[in-house]
Design a protein with these regions (language model features):
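Hydrophobic side chains within alpha-helical segments
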Residues: 64, 70-71, 96-98, 110, ...
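Helix-rich "cap/lid" substructures immediately adjacent to catalytic or cofactor-binding pockets
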Residues: 2-87, 167
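Short, glycine/charge-rich beta-strand/loop segments that flank catalytic centers
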Residues: 51-52, 87-91, 116, 128-132
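Gly/Ala-rich beta-loop-alpha elbow adjacent to hydrolase catalytic centers
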Residues: 68, 84-92, 96, 104
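Residue-level recognition of oxygen-bearing side chains
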Residues: 27, 91, 172
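Alpha-helix C-terminal capping segments
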Residues: 74, 78, 97-103
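Alpha/beta catalytic cores of group-transfer enzymes, especially the acyltransferase/condensing modules
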Residues: 11-13, 100-187
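An amphipathic alpha-helix/helix-turn recognition signal
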Residues: 30, 63, 90-91, 103, ...
């Protein structure tokens, strides 16, 4: 295999059933079991079953780390040469650090769990929200955010890729603005 780099994803790329193809793989399952034992939480059921808990920050962040390390370990078991570099998008940086041997898996689980708790506590429950806006140019997302501003706040906070911008702010304003984004051409 030629030289390659692995980029581990951040929060927002999770989905129910995302690990279904690996449900019988012992390496993947043992990685989830290791995390479950360390954090006393069954993350496998959140990715395998219809469980909305996968979208709660306190679960999503460990799930993304666990999934990334499970696939990293699986890749290593296949005898494929190691990548020339590792990187992570946002939360994925922790996965890259574990894969590079900088920190242990359990250290990363503890750090990511604390990170998720801090992020969740930064905004009172049910006050804030985030949404990924797909299919619009960055400038169009900015314009819609500015057009719907009121006493509440909503801003683009993460320009993930062309056509994918994450907005964050007051939950009510985000929910009310979704139609405006669709009218502007969002999917």
């Amino acid at each position: 295999m030629k030289n390659y780099t692995i980029l581990f994803p951040g929060q927002g790329s999770q989905s129910i059933g995302m690990m279904d193809s690996f449900s019988t793989n012992t390496i993947v399952k043992s990685t989830f079991d290791e995390a479950a034992e360390h954090l006393k939480k069954d993350f496998w059921s959140m990715v395998a079953l219809e469980n909305s808990a996968i979208h709660q920050t306190e679960n999503t962040q460990p799930i993304m780390l666990i999934s990334g390390i499970a696939l990293w370990r699986l890749l290593g078991s296949l005898g494929i040469n190691k990548p020339i570099s590792l990187a992570g998008h946002s939360l994925g940086e922790f996965t890259a650090l574990v894969a590079a041997g900088v920190i242990s898996f359990t250290e990363a689980l503890d750090l990511v769990t604390q990170r998720a708790k801090l992020m969740q506590s930064a905004v009172p429950d049910q006050v804030g929200a985030m949404a990924a806006i797909l299919g619009l140019e960055d400038e169009a997302v900015v314009r819609v955010c500015q057009a719907v501003q009121s006493d509440e706040v909503m801003e683009p906070v993460n320009f993930n890729s062309p056509g994918q911008v994450v907005i964050a702010g007051h939950r009510n304003l985000i929910e009310q603005s979704l139609d405006s984004f669709k009218e502007a051409g969002a999917k």
